[in-house]
């Protein structure tokens, strides 16, 4: 039971972290302007479509790549969207770091799968 207690303690600490607080504030500011939300949504839609094409083995359409680059150029000039993306990235980095710490503590977990992949 102590493991679960510690997990809940970690969850509480995460919810009080500066990374999460900064993310929440940046998200609220972003969502206060529908144009910003639409611009970010459009960028992410284009980004996902391009990633899906690559993952399915297709060569991305050059026009789609250009549209994504232009969309990125536009949103990178918007301080509200940029602040949101930076806060989102910092929170994601924190969560990834914590996940790595947890996985590294269990070196045998998943080892058989990794060994099997390495054999191929």
Curated annotation (Swiss-Prot):
InterPro entries, alphabetized: Com_YlbF (IPR010368), YheA/YmcA-like_dom_sf (IPR023378)
Superkingdom of source: Bacteria
Short name of one Pfam family: Com_YlbF
SUPFAM superfamilies linked: YheA/YmcA-like (SSF158622)
UniProt record similarity statement: Belongs to the UPF0342 family.
HAMAP family membership: UPF0342
Protein name: UPF0342 protein Moth_0821
UniProt source species: Moorella thermoacetica (strain ATCC 39073 / JCM 9320)
